[in-house]
Design a protein with these regions (language model features):
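Short beta-strand element of the alpha/beta-hydrolase
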Residues: 145-157
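Primarily recognizes the serine-hydrolase "nucleophile elbow" in alpha/beta-hydrolase
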Residues: 204-265
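Short amphipathic alpha-helix adjacent to the substrate-entry channel of hydrolases
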Residues: 165-183
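Alpha/beta-hydrolase active-site loop signature
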Residues: 158, 187-191
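Short N-terminal helix/helix-N-cap motif within the alpha/beta-hydrolase-1
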Residues: 161-165, 192-193
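The conserved SAM/SAH-binding core of class I Rossmann-like methyltransferase domains
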Residues: 183-185, 264
Length: 265
């Protein structure tokens, strides 16, 4: 694990790199960059991140955040699916169907986040080199003939510093444990690659998953997609544009539909 100083330095470097790239692409991005630096890289924020990595504060803060988010999400799910929605939840290898994980379970997933990490790495799904690679997370003990539901994770990073490494590890570890196969992807970065390059890459990755995931034990007929920030935008757009030939150059007739999408900021 990297030291707090290394983590803070990395985040600052990423911010400056992003700012440099965006400013070269458009002078109008100056205000956005300054706002990002002030909001996400202010001294008090960096100090908090540094302290959290070397003290129990990280676990306490995470527990409080999980509890708050759980109340909001629970209310939304009850309003949509009814108060008994947990009884409708099924995971393929879940030993306690309908059971809602508590804060301790979430923290445990974070602690063991590498348990199923990237059992197959850097698979090429397109022509753009490293920008078109993906990793597959899965349990090594999946039953023979088993067809696991698939979750595609689209990383965030202002469409310019996105990387499949280091994002959503607790989520993918937990879903893998429940019997899912998770696929995390790289895609083209701005400003060297302008829109719609990003969404074309995401849809190309979906097409690859549909055509190949059965070889890894996945079910091509049940593919969900998620992502945060820029990844949330792209996962939403991908879910809403299945079969749009203008966003699928060279693979116009490929199946890029998904069965579910869960974007977040």
């Amino acid at each position: 694990m990297s030291s707090p100083i290394e983590q803070v330095t990395t985040r600052c470097t990423q911010a400056l790199h992003t700012g440099s790239l965006l400013l070269r692409g458009s002078p109008a991005a100056a205000g956005w960059v300054l706002g990002w630096l002030n909001a996400e890289f202010a001294p008090q924020v960096l100090t908090g991140h540094a302290l959290a990595t070397v003290s129990p504060l990280q676990r306490v803060a995470c527990a409080l955040a999980v509890q708050k988010a759980d109340k909001v999400l629970d209310a939304a799910l009850e309003e949509t699916f009814g108060k008994d929605y947990t009884s409708q939840v099924r995971h393929p290898l879940d030993e306690e169907p309908g059971h809602r994980p508590n804060v301790a379970a979430v923290l445990d997933a974070m602690h063991h986040r590498r348990r199923y990490a990237a059992t197959t790495r850097n698979i090429s799904y397109g022509p753009r080199g490293r920008n078109n690679t993906l990793d597959i997370w899965r349990r090594p003990d999946l039953p023979d003939g088993y067809r696991a539901p698939v979750l595609i994770q689209v990383p965030g990073g202002a469409w310019s510093v996105n990387d499949k490494r280091g994002q959503a590890y607790p989520l993918m570890a937990r879903m893998s444990e429940l019997g899912w196969i998770c696929v995390t992807i790289n895609y083209s970065r701005s400003p060297r690659n302008a829109f719609p390059s990003h969404i074309i890459d995401v849809k190309r990755a979906i097409a690859w998953v549909k055509a190949n995931i059965a070889e890894y034990g996945g079910d091509p007929d049940f593919v969900a997609i998620t992502g945060g920030s820029a990844g949330g935008h792209l996962s939403s757009l991908a879910a809403l544009s299945a079969g749009d030939e203008t966003l699928q150059p060279g693979f116009e007739h490929a199946d890029t539909s998904v069965q579910a999408v869960a974007p977040y900021y």
